[in-house]
Amino acid sequence: LFSGSSYAKNIPPGSGIGDVPANILILLDKSGSMSVRMTSGSGFMYPYSAAADSSGDVYVGSYWTYGIKKLTYATGAVDTSFASSGTYTGSGNCRSYYPMNIKIHNGYMYVASYYQHRVFRVNLSTGACDWNHYIRYARNIAIGNNILYATGYYGNAVIRNLSTNSNISC
């Protein structure tokens, strides 16, 4: 019923070495470009939101690791000089805790932090968080005509004039 011998199949046609027996689980690509583990220190686990700045750099919010990472346009790699070893987690009212939405506008990163119940702003040049606002289960951000619109569950919202840095009452 059981045999101690194992047998290998030949490499699929077109691989160039069809006469050498081998055990192949899956062949994705020969260049090795797919060997990066996305849950390693330089990868992502459950990326939820992404935004690009004017230089083409991309900021990705990962809700499992509660952080935001920056990928540089030139290399496509995580920029380890961004925030703390390449990941912004923040603290206090500017903590990135399940970042549900990210927007980049005029050198600032705006984040809707779902379980922190905050929308906050980080200066991308200095890394300082200089504004935050309570929104229960902050979820969505939109920016148009220098006006920030942020919403959460249960009718929570904030509208902010980014030119004057003041909230607008409706």
Language-model regions, residue ranges each:
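Residue-level detector of Asp-centered blade-edge/turn motifs that repeat once per structural unit
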Residues: 52-54, 104-107, 143-146
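A short beta-strand motif characteristic of beta-propeller blades
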Residues: 40-42, 77-93, 128-133, 166-170
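Signature of short aromatic-glycine-proline-rich micro-motifs recurring in repeat-based ectodomains
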Residues: 43-50, 93-103, 136-139
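Short loop/turn segments that connect beta-strands within beta-propeller blades
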Residues: 72-76, 123-127, 161-165
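Acidic, polar low-complexity linker/tail segments
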Residues: 2-39
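A short loop-to-beta-strand structural motif that recurs across blades of beta-propeller domains
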Residues: 66-70, 117-120, 155-158
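Conserved beta-propeller blade signature
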Residues: 57-61, 108-111, 147-150
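Short loop/turn segments immediately following the C-termini of beta-strands
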Residues: 63, 114, 153
